[in-house]
């Protein structure tokens, strides 16, 4: 803790800096909750109502924050990898069925166990690190697989390659 010099007629400084560091210590699920606890023997300021609080600087390790967490279809769906996102393709009056993007854990975190499937009593899938996606290309691969499945469903010869997204 550091203080600047006071210019008022009181004994407390004009500015008080209180530095806090919360280290990243992941647990077995990969989480690191931002918790700070301090037991001080004296107050930081004696009359807090005379002060304003500002967060002057902070740093977050963004490589540990997922870019997206796909939403999984609720019950009656029982496939924990069946997302709510879908694609369909049509060509010359021939259409594919609705192909849902399948979450592929082998592209993200193959060692994390899958959550429980949705049930009548618990219709939504629990969001766990199993679903964390840290880069765009991983999610695009999942979309491309759904596009390829839709393309292959069209029985008429299209005369083109399957559409894909690239990053």
Swiss-Prot record:
This is Uncharacterized protein V18. It comes from the Viruses. It holds the Pfam family V18-19.
